[in-house]
A protein has these predicted regions:
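Mid-bilayer segments of alpha-helical transmembrane spans in multi-pass integral membrane proteins
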Residues: 71, 106-122, 142-150
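Hydrophobic transmembrane alpha-helices
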Residues: 1-47, 52-53
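Hydrophobic alpha-helical transmembrane segments
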Residues: 7-12, 33, 55-59, 75-76, ...
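Interfacial aromatic-anchored transmembrane helix boundaries in multi-pass membrane proteins
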Residues: 22-31, 62-91
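Alpha-helical transmembrane segments and their cytosolic interface
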Residues: 3, 134-171
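Short helix-perturbing small/polar motifs within transmembrane alpha-helices
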Residues: 78-114, 118
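Membrane-helix interface "capping/anchor" motifs
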Residues: 45-56, 93-99
């Protein structure tokens, strides 16, 4: 793909990612869903343009979201986890045996989750101790992450087999 086409596609994907995050900011119950949909845009960028361009799209979308969104939760989730995970996932998938690959994926998610909790505690100035609730949330979040990880794999496979030929033609 020529460089001008890459730049144009990167601009369109950045705008699309920002629009999804903006919708998640407007409807605050959709903040996690918007970040997950934004990560699908990054996944498509990774497939079509490669790691470097996908990273540029992630960074530009995250910066735009942090600066412009009225409600920052989708921007925080996207910037601290959902945006970079599709780029990192390819490297994590190559770890053998598969058990260690899953351990690495869950470790990356848990580091991001701890960062998100710390950011939200600072932003919301929460002082109360909710240790039991936090442990339950971490457990449910890890289960949700495994579903998200599986869904990303299925979405990538569907994109390769069905959507890419429709959108870009057979190459």
């Amino acid at each position: 793909m020529k460089n001008t086409k890459k730049i144009a596609l990167a601009g369109v994907l950045t705008a699309l990612c920002f629009v999804f995050l903006y919708v998640g900011s407007l409807f605050q119950t959709m903040d996690l869903s918007a970040a997950a949909i934004g990560s699908i845009v990054i996944l498509i960028a990774f497939i079509e343009l490669g790691k470097k361009w996908a990273f540029y799209i992630y960074v530009s979308s995250a910066i735009l979201s942090i600066l412009l969104l009225p409600y920052k939760s989708p921007a925080a989730v996207f910037a601290l986890f959902a945006g970079f995970y599709p780029i990192l996932k390819e490297s994590l998938n190559r770890i053998k045996p598969i058990f260690l690959s899953y351990v690495a994926r869950i470790a990356v998610f848990n580091v991001a989750l701890v960062l998100l909790v710390l950011v939200f505690k600072k932003l919301l100035a929460i002082e109360a101790d909710y240790a039991k609730l936090e442990m339950a949330i971490f457990g449910l979040a890890n289960i949700t992450f495994l579903v998200y990880d599986f869904a990303l794999e299925r979405i990538a496979a569907t994109y390769f087999t069905r959507l890419k030929p429709l959108i870009f033609g057979k190459r």
